[in-house]
């Protein structure tokens, strides 16, 4: 009876060791693969955004500029990180806008003229979160991306009130990580954020799952090998 109890305890210990080894290995496998897929998703996000903007290439644009409209050159080692001020005149009047340093540096366009162009184009045909997310998802599907994506589009109007729109599927939003954020427009009034969600079961490949199962089985085999050697 005592011998059977000792064997059971030893079996449980071997099983726990195997499970712990599988969990630790699985964690590092998951983190490694997640990092890889995040890089892929981030690069493809900008590709999707470019493709979405190309849909508006047929819009006729009439812009009038005067004076010095050139924005300061982005310096990523600038320790001051001071905001910049831009002036605009539209049908709503004249106004100076203060752009935070982070928004200025994360605008996808460096040219001030191109930024003004995007402001006008997206005023005429606003960015759609669903449309962008669909393009992003379709491009990611080509590389067999194992996660889920969500897009948020934030727009700050002339009176500096911000509104947010999300792509349809929000079931994973609370579990998702903010992967990439960028801005468009002369005053960086349009913010686009891409979210990703990864289930560990989907991220790990069949080979990874077999490896984790093998670790548990191997720990149990140690118990039976020991029993065999004793006998």
Which sequence ranges carry the predicted segments?
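Extreme N-terminal signal-anchor transmembrane helix of membrane signaling/transducer proteins, especially
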Residues: 7-26
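The feature marks either
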Residues: 35-196
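N-terminal membrane-insertion alpha helix
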Residues: 20-38
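Membrane-anchoring signal-anchor transmembrane alpha-helices and their immediate flanking context
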Residues: 1-2, 25
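Juxtamembrane interface at the cytosolic side of transmembrane helices
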Residues: 2-10, 202-231
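A hydrophobic membrane-anchoring alpha-helix module
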Residues: 185-188, 201, 205
């Amino acid at each position: 009876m005592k011998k059977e109890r000792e064997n059971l305890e030893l079996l449980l210990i071997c099983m726990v060791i195997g499970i712990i080894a599988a969990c630790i290995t699985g964690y590092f496998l998951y983190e490694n693969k997640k990092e890889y897929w995040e890089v892929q998703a981030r690069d493809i996000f900008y590709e999707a955004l470019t493709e979405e903007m190309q849909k508006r290439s047929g819009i006729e644009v009439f812009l009038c500029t005067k004076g010095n409209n050139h924005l300061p050159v982005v310096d990523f080692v600038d320790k001051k990180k001071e905001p910049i001020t831009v002036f605009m005149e539209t049908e709503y009047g004249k106004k100076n806008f203060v752009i935070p340093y982070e928004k200025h540096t994360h605008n996808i366009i460096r040219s001030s003229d191109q930024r003004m162009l995007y402001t006008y184009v997206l005023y005429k045909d606003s960015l759609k979160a669903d449309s962008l997310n669909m393009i992003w998802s379709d491009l990611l599907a080509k590389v067999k991306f194992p996660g889920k994506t969500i897009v948020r589009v934030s727009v700050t109007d002339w009176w500096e009130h911000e509104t947010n729109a999300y792509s349809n599927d929000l079931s994973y939003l609370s579990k998702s990580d903010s992967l990439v954020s960028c801005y468009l427009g002369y005053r960086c009034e349009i913010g686009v954020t891409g979210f990703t969600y990864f289930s560990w079961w989907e991220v790990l490949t069949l080979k990874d799952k077999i490896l984790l199962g093998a670790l548990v089985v191997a720990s149990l085999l140690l118990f039976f090998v020991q029993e065999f050697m004793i006998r």
